[in-house]
Amino acid sequence: MDRRIFGLENEYGVTCVFRGQRRLSPDEVARYLFRRVVSWGRSSNVFLKNGARLYLDVGSHPEYATPECDSVPDLVTHDKAGERILEGLLVEAERRLREEGIAGDIHLFKNNTDSAGNSYGCHENYLVGRHGEFSKLADVLVPFLVSRQILCGAGKVLQTPRGAVYCISQRAEHIWESVSSATTRSRPIINTRDEPHADAERFRRLHVIVGDSNMSETTMLLKLGSTDLVLRMIEAGVMLRDMTLENPIRAIREVSHDMTCQRKIKLANGREVSALDIQREYYSKAVEFVERRGGDEVAKRVLDLWGRTLLAIETDDLELVAREIDWVTKYVLIERFRHKHGLSLASPRVAELDLKYHDIHRDRGLYYRMERAGLVERVTRDLDVFEAKSRPPQTTRARLRGEFIKRAQEKRRDFTVDWVHLKLNDQAQRTVLCKDPFRSVDDRVDKLIASM
């Protein structure tokens, strides 16, 4: 597929820290956060003018689903726009708390685990063709996704009975199946529930739920871009070596607990390889593929960072990618902090630092303090992120949805939308079905908008 539709869904952790006596549950905090949303959308599940979806997920986790994007840099921009939208809700909620005499700060964390051991996710969506066997696609992808965490893990200090350890991935401990139709109960690597949000005869939506939420824009670019390249190779019929894992669930934990990425994991055919070996195999094939087929600047940037990350791990020179790869950035930050203050990895101050890295408030979050200090690389520009808060991607179906919502709100018309339907809730109940996510211009939608 030369042009692909991408989407990201991020769930956020929420807490409220008080200096006073009164405490709020996550449910109550979520109500404060979404009060403004409910006031104009009459629901805590809404679509926005930029084509995105914002809602409260299971367990009072705010979730932001990006609009459909047809390039990885666009997707990174719209994911960051989601952070800014939620930060705006946070600031408004804190103002309301102060007005009601409740002292305290609300924190939103773009991470994947809380102190109670609960996990919430970052779900990646890739549009793929309906032709071909989905099981074969999954067979090739699972070893890639299990080992991909060495490129794009968010890092985590994990407290174990044997002491604290630094893990590469936050999500690895919470994955229980390779392929399944569940998302919360068994948490598979790939979710097979067949909801394409497009023409089901032509398309299928690959739903990957194994990845960590990323603060780093460059890590996000590598996560999405490398997966896209592997999908392109599969679609083009490139012969990839059989890397089927004997036990993917055991392997994903073993990889996460091994910062050298050299520990051997068993393949179904009896061979033993490391996560580094697996990634080297996919990377070398991707380099050949792009050299043969040609690639744009995004593909070249992805391959450059992919190769440098593998080299940094292989040579134990993590500083090579300390500005670009989340788990490395955070590890270097924690190690410097520990050595400066003489702390063990199990120190509560280290746990606090670990969490602060993921705070999306730009004045409080450690990642954003590093960004302001020029200590991390970027993909986006502030202006583009700001515009993406209210402007949908202009080359996908999201443009139609965004324009419809914008006009309906301006005209104070009652409407209902989802990923494929645009409906005016008037006497005629006029509805347009938009099954092609690549289509950004549609006469039927123009007429519906003009009729308001």
From Swiss-Prot:
The catalytic site is made up of: 57 (proton acceptor)
Any idea what this protein is called? Pup--protein ligase
Biological process terms in GO annotation:
modification-dependent protein catabolic process; proteasomal protein catabolic process; protein pupylation
Top EC class per UniProt?
A: ligase
Molecular-function GO terms, alphabetical? ATP binding; ligase activity, forming carbon-nitrogen bonds; magnesium ion binding; ubiquitin-like protein transferase activity
Taxonomic lineage:
Bacteria, Bacillati, Actinomycetota, Actinomycetes, Frankiales
- What does the protein in this record do? Catalyzes the covalent attachment of the prokaryotic ubiquitin-like protein modifier Pup to the proteasomal substrate proteins, thereby targeting them for proteasomal degradation. This tagging system is termed pupylation. The ligation reaction involves the side-chain carboxylate of the C-terminal glutamate of Pup and the side-chain amino group of a substrate lysine.
Named in its record, the pathway it takes part in is: Protein degradation; proteasomal Pup-dependent pathway; Protein modification; protein pupylation
Task: Report the superkingdom from the record.
Answer: Bacteria
Catalytic reaction list = ATP + [prokaryotic ubiquitin-like protein]-L-glutamate + [protein]-L-lysine = ADP + phosphate + N(6)-([prokaryotic ubiquitin-like protein]-gamma-L-glutamyl)-[protein]-L-lysine
